[in-house]
C-alpha cells in the first residue's frame, strides 16, 4: 500500500492484505496528519491489494474508490455507486501539486488490472507486473524510498529486461513500484 499526499487531495494506492489491518489505521492517521483520505485506488482484485478496501471506505466515508471498479458493487454491496468512480486509460486525478494518471496495464494479473503514474515523482505503480528487482548483496526490500540509492532505476535496467513494447503514450518513468519497498 502507498499513500500519496497532494497539496489538495490524497490517494491510497492498493490497501494491503487484511491481515495487516491492525497497524494500518494508526499509520494512516500519522501520515495524514489531520487530513482526510479522498481516494482509494486498487490496482486489481487480489487480496494483497484490496484486502482492506471495505474497512478503509467505512473508516473514511467521504473517500471514493477509483480505477476499474466495474465489479466492485458485487464485492462491496454496502457502497453507494457514487463512491465508485470508474477511470479509463489516460484519465487523471488532480491532487493539487501532482496528478495520478490511470493506465491500462500491459500485463494484467487479473482482468481489470490498472496501473497508476504519479506525474510529480515520475513514478509508475505497476501492480504485480515487475516483481522485485534487487541483488542479494543489497537490502533494497528493507529500504524506504528516500533511503534508496539515487541510481537505482538505472541499475535496475542492467538486471531486468522488460519483454514488452508499444506504450500508447510516451511517459518518462524514473521509478517503478510493484509492491511496497
Provide a role label for each language-model segment.
Residues 132-181:
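Cap/insert and terminal regions of metallo-dependent hydrolase folds
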Amino acid at each position: 500500500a502507498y499513500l500519496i499526499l497532494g497539496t489538495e487531495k490524497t490517494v491510497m494506492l492498493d490497501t494491503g492484505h487484511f491481515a495487516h489491518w491492525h497497524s494500518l489505521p494508526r499509520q494512516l492517521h500519522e501520515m495524514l496528519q489531520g487530513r482526510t483520505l479522498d481516494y482509494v485506488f486498487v490496482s486489481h482484485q487480489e487480496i494483497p491489494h484490496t484486502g482492506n478496501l471495505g474497512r478503509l471506505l467505512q473508516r473514511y466515508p467521504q473517500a471514493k474508490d477509483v480505477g476499474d471498479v466495474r465489479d466492485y458493487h458485487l464485492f462491496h454491496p454496502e457502497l453507494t455507486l457514487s463512491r465508485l468512480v470508474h477511470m479509463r486509460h489516460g484519465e487523471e486525478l488532480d491532487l493539487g501539486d501532482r496528478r495520478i494518471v490511470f493506465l491500462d496495464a500491459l500485463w494484467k494479473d487479473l482482468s481489470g488490472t490498472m496501473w497508476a503514474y504519479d506525474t510529480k515523482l515520475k513514478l509508475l505503480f505497476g501492480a504485480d507486473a515487475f516483481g522485485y528487482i534487487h541483488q542479494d548483496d543489497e537490502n533494497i526490500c528493507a529500504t524506504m524510498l528516500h533511503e534508496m540509492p539515487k541510481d537505482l532505476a538505472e541499475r535496475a535496467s542492467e538486471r531486468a529486461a522488460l519483454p514488452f513494447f508499444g506504450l500508447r503514450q510516451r511517459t518518462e518513468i524514473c521509478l517503478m513500484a510493484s509492491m511496497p519497498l
